[in-house]
């Protein structure tokens, strides 16, 4: 049985701006995000971690840097943990995207959708499932910290409970939250979901009118 600790990156500049960042380069953490990172080492103090694997995106690497040092672990990069390729939607305001005709399809039938010049949800699900299967076979007794993005965590939770791709948008994942799952060849278990492990004094969230999710949580873009 392999235990996966999914840590969504801390609050980012894109979160602050209500932007769908996707795989755009040069997007780091916000002021709130750096404040969250300062508390991560303490939050993980008593948690066993055998290895750390991260998305290659800047906001993920900034999230895990000091935590990895405190655990004296090297951070490996796996491109399968990268955020979804939202294609031509990348860099756009979520307030604008939520008014587009395709938004309803993304929320209710994501299995049928591919982003223009980007990735399909089926492809995203396939790369995450392949990664988790490979890691659980290779490291059957380890606890692995994965630093990644909102939609990846949501897909992993959906795969674990067997809710199906068309229901994964019902999950919501906050920045710097922890989701814990275990996988083996015979079973999959969701141990905890969207656990708030750090808080920032005075932290404020931007609420989207749609109440739907893309890229993470309902109330943080």
Language-model-detected regions and their locations in the chain:
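Short, active-site-adjacent cap segments at secondary-structure transitions
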Residues: 13, 59-61, 83-84, 152-154
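Short beta-strand scaffold positions
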Residues: 54-55, 126, 147-148
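Active-site-proximal alpha-helix that buttresses catalytic centers in soluble enzyme cores
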Residues: 11-73, 77
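A glycine-rich beta-strand to alpha-helix segment
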Residues: 139-153
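Phosphate-handling substructures
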Residues: 14, 69-129, 182, 189-192, ...
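Active-site signature of alpha/beta-hydrolase-fold catalytic machinery across serine-
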Residues: 66, 155-159
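Short, hydrophobic/glycine-enriched beta-strand segments
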Residues: 3-9, 147
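Acidic, low-complexity terminal tails and accessory targeting/binding regions
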Residues: 2, 84-95, 137, 142, ...
């Amino acid at each position: 049985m392999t235990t996966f600790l999914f840590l969504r990156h801390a609050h980012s500049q894109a979160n602050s701006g209500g932007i769908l960042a996707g795989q755009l380069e040069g997007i780091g953490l916000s002021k709130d995000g750096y404040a969250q990172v300062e508390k991560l080492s303490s939050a993980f103090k008593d948690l066993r971690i055998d290895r750390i694997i991260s998305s290659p995106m800047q906001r993920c690497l900034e999230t895990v840097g000091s935590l990895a040092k405190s655990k004296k672990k090297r951070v490996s990069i796996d491109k399968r943990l990268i955020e979804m390729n939202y294609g031509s939607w990348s860099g756009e305001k979520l307030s604008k995207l939520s008014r587009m005709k395709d938004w309803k399809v993304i929320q209710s039938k994501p299995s049928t959708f591919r982003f223009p010049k980007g990735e399909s949800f089926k492809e995203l699900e396939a790369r995450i499932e392949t990664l988790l299967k490979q890691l659980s076979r290779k490291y059957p007794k380890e606890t692995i910290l994965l630093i990644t993005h909102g939609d990846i965590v949501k897909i992993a939770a959906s795969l674990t409970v067997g809710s199906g791709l068309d229901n994964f948008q019902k999950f919501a994942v906050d920045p710097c939250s922890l989701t814990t799952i275990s996988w083996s060849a015979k079973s999959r278990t969701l141990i905890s979901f969207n656990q708030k492990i750090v808080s920032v004094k005075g932290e404020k969230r931007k609420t989207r009118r749609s109440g739907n999710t893309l890229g993470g949580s309902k109330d943080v873009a």
